[in-house]
Amino acid sequence: MSSLIQTKTICTKDNIILSKDTQNNAFHLKFDIENPNIVLPNLITFGIFQLLGELNKDVLESITVTKTYSDSEIDLLYIFKQFGADLGISQKYMHIRVKGFAEDKKITFTSSSSKCDSEIDKELELIENSESTMVVEWEHDHKVHVSYYFSAHVQDNLPIYMENLMGMLTKKMFYRVKTFIENMKI
């Protein structure tokens, strides 16, 4: 007997589809980026993660490359801004190892939680078991399709109305990246 992935669409606003795998609480984002002024495949490097941090300073306190293993493998430390302090939610951080794989007309970034050797404030709480896969396929030089599948375990018992918070915050961050790239001029 095969098990089927059960997904629920959470939000389709701004031409970004956010859905949730209800069996394992993982999220999936799908969207296109198009800009006739920019050769988009040239932008799809590890630098995209730094751009994510620069455009989302209200969500992310910092994104730091803590170690570079090669041109295709790095460790990243995300420190999130605190939200929900009045609900007893502590400030979070996440440390991941990211690997990039380039193929014909496609690049894939995979990440998973990794041990952090950097000094971390004891008040911060680790987001555990973080995993993601981002696949960027280009239709042509000026249009790419992005698929981002991610999951992370947060220790807090969030109220039911906040169960999709991680997905919605991630969508907001990628919306800003999409908008920034689509509005770039040479």
PLM features: what roles do these ranges have?
Residues N35, F83-D86, A152-L158:
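A generic structural motif
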Residues F180-I186:
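Short, highly charged C-terminal tails/helix-capping segments
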Residues L169-T179:
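C-terminal functional regions of eukaryotic proteins
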Residues M94-V98, T110-G167:
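Beta-strand/loop substructures that line and gate deep hydrophobic ligand-binding cavities in soluble
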Residues V39-T45, V98, Y148, V177:
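Hydrophobic pocket/interface hotspot
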Residues M1-L77, L87:
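Hydrophobic ligand-binding cavity/cleft-lining segments
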Residues P41-N42, E163, G167, K171:
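Generic detection of long, well-ordered alpha-helical segments
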Residues T22-N24, I33, E61-D121:
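Glycine-rich portal/gate segments that line the openings of hydrophobic small-molecule binding cavities
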